[in-house]
Regions:
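Short glycine/threonine-rich turn/loop motifs
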Residues: 28-145, 208-307, 314-317, 341-345
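Residue-level detector of well-ordered alpha-helical segments, enriched
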Residues: 88, 117, 187-194, 234, ...
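C-terminal substrate/ligand-recognition segments
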Residues: 280, 290, 320-323, 330-334
């Protein structure tokens, strides 16, 4: 199931870098007064076009699924979905904090209630794999699993959950509006469907999308340079697709062993020895805002995470200057939080 790095593609990209100027802007010797980007906007756009589509809100979906989305929003904030009514989806995936919550994760870690960092809930609809170990292939199965997991909502007794919701008067009209053709609308299946409807519209269009749509000024000269370096260092080999990741599984520490071997990732799902240290490649959307980084939260700073993954995954030494340049590009993947959509009930 997991895909390894495509070495042939990487070599082809390297050859292209060495023998093509990619539309580099020419600069006169000694001219240091004006910042000239190392690559033209159109040249960088052409690099990303083969695998990236512009991310934008689907107004038709928002209108068509309005009642289901509204129900999902209410459920997302409701702590009564958890066994002891202590935690909601939003407590871990804080929508006001780009869909994650480092403080909450730290608290759970101290209590030994979790061993993995909390990934962002935003832009999940465009992923092919879910969970750090890629153990789910649909958002629906991931959402249902989160409710039952002892490390998340801990509500494995779905009968108890449905009985609880049916006893809450406010939910009866919400479920009836969202599922008007269902004679028994308050069911586990409809609950999950409503949550997924809400989660699927949690997207954050960013400057990179305006850039890919043709706005040359959406990215700064520094971000253009960082984008070129992102490609030159083969980051896009794994962090590919519109979400810049979330499409494949990969061995963490493919070239140099990952320092923390306590969590073996996908191996726990398959029990296949070759799957030890296999993890899902993370989406880089909003990565600037979602520290700490990696499943083990081993990097607090984005530039450090860039250097670390390059060293262990590709065997490449990336200087601090280069890492900061890539970090500047990654800021262009930070989108706007849909404030109206995520208002608390």
């Amino acid at each position: 199931m997991y895909k390894a790095i495509n070495i042939n593609r990487a070599l082809s990209l390297l050859i292209a870098v060495l023998f093509s100027n990619f539309g580099f802007a020419q600069q006169n010797p000694g001219d240091t007064q004006t910042k000239t980007p190392a690559i033209s906007p159109q040249a960088l756009r052409d690099l990303f076009k083969p695998y990236m589509k512009v991310l934008e809100h689907d107004q038709e979906m928002l209108k068509k699924s309005r009642e289901s989305i509204e129900l999902g929003r209410v459920l997302f904030y409701d702590r009564r979905l958890s066994l002891k009514s202590e935690v909601s989806c939003n407590d871990c995936h804080d929508l006001a904090k780009h869909g994650t919550n480092g403080d909450h994760y730290t608290g759970l870690l101290k209590q030994k209630k979790t061993k993995r960092d909390v990934p962002s809930i935003y832009n999940k609809g465009g992923l092919k794999l879910f969970n750090w170990d890629g153990s789910h292939t649909t958002l629906k199965s991931k959402t249902a699993s989160a409710i039952a997991s002892e490390h998340e909502m801990n509500m494995a007794d779905t009968d108890l959950l449905i009985q609880r919701l049916k006893g809450i008067a406010g939910y009866q009209p919400l479920f009836a509006k969202a599922f008007p053709k269902d004679k028994d609308p308050i069911r586990m299946e409809t609950l999950v469907e409503a949550l997924v409807s809400f989660e699927e519209v949690l997207i954050t269009p960013a400057p990179i999308d305006r850039f890919m749509a043709g706005n040359d000024k959406a990215l700064s000269a520094e971000q253009l340079e960082g984008g070129l370096l992102f490609d030159r260092k083969f980051c896009a080999t794994c962090h590919t697709g519109t979400m810049f990741g979330g499409q494949m599984l990969q061995k963490l520490g493919a070239v140099r062993s990952w320092p923390n071997q306590k969590d073996l990732g996908y191996y726990y799902t398959t029990k296949v020895p070759e799957h030890k240290m296999i993890f899902r490649v993370s989406s880089l959307r909003n990565v600037e805002k979602t520290a700490p980084y990696f499943h083990d939260a081993s990097s607090r700073h984005l530039w450090d995470a860039v250097r670390k993954i390059a060293w262990h995954e590709l065997g490449q030494f990336v200087s601090v200057k280069e890492a900061l340049s890539i970090q500047e590009f990654l800021k262009a993947l930070t989108g706007d939080i849909p404030k109206e959509l995520i208002k608390k009930p």
